[in-house]
């Protein structure tokens, strides 16, 4: 994200060097659904080029490879009492590369070694390589929880517990697209009640005349309320509902059935449920 030449936007969100592995992780995830060798051969050159870039971009610091400079998108931290955003190896960078390199290895490529993120001293998943102070505890972004969702590599129980603490600390507010992310995260953590709470919040009626709305909600046509509107909120909540159904993270209020939800490896699931329980 961002254009280093003539960059006029804030470093709080513009100079992020990690879009490529995220996009390629999505391509590999698609491959795992269809397992088509022709498709795999089509995407392999992109993985080779991206891998070559990060082999060159990573630098050694304290005996470990890190990204630098980088940011945790749109967030800031406190360092010696000063608000800052540029740093090295934010957790999202680490988590993206951890998965990207794993995908590369499955494609037969040799990669550097990157360790998975670990819980901080407060039991949460840290947002940065160092435990900086927070400038906005309930920030709308949850970038540092990529290792939980949408990452395909299952997180450890320790990381899942740390993610729960992180989400509770961030709260249940945010823009519509932020609520979408949180629905997906709670669904991956198999907490259907918290996911459903956010879905209902996202479906709260918002007047079309609203100029700006930070708490989610939907216009009468069900567009995500974030003027003019942001489709991220709509797609994010839909993805979260699919994740809830896949993981049987069902709130007590739900009864119904699903048919043909796709899984990796060409598999699919169908089942009925009543009062939040599979039957």
Task: Give the predicted meaning of each segment.
Residues 58-59, 88, 138-140, 245-246, ...:
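A general structural signal for short secondary-structure junctions and capping/turn motifs
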Residues 82-86, 251-279:
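Surface beta-strand/loop "capping" patches
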Residues 1-41, 45, 91-247:
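Active-site core of glycosidic bond-cleaving carbohydrate-active enzymes
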Residues 39-49, 64-70, 197-201, 249-256:
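Beta-strand segments within the central parallel beta-sheet cores of soluble alpha/beta enzyme folds
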Residues 49-107:
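Acidic/histidine-rich catalytic neighborhood
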């Amino acid at each position: 994200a961002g254009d280093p030449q003539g960059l006029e936007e804030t470093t709080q969100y513009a100079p992020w060097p990690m879009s490529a592995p995220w996009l390629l992780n999505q391509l590999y995830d698609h491959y795992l659904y269809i397992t088509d060798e022709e498709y795999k051969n089509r995407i392999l050159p992109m993985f080779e080029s991206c891998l070559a870039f990060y082999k060159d971009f990573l630098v050694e610091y304290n005996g470990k490879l890190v990204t630098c400079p980088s940011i945790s998108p749109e967030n800031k931290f406190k360092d010696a009492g000063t608000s800052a955003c540029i740093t090295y190896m934010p957790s999202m960078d680490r988590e993206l590369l951890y998965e990207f390199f794993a995908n590369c290895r499955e494609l037969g490529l040799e990669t550097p070694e990157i360790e998975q993120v670990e819980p901080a001293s407060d039991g949460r998943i840290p947002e940065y390589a160092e435990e900086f102070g927070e400038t906005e505890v309930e920030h709308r972004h949850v970038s540092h929880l990529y290792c939980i969702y949408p990452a395909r590599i299952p997180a450890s129980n320790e990381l899942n517990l740390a993610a729960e603490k992180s989400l509770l600390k961030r709260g249940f507010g945010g823009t519509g697209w932020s609520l979408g992310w949180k629905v997906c995260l709670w669904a991956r953590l198999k907490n259907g009640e918290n996911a459903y709470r956010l879905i209902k919040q996202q479906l709260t009626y918002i007047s079309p005349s609203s100029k700006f709305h930070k708490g989610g909600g939907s216009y009468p046509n069900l567009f995500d309320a974030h003027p003019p509107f942001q489709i991220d909120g709509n797609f994010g909540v839909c993805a979260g509902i699919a994740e809830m159904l896949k993981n049987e993270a069902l709130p007590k209020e739900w009864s119904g059935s699903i048919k043909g939800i796709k899984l990796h490896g060409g598999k699919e699931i169908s089942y009925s449920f009543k009062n939040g329980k599979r039957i």
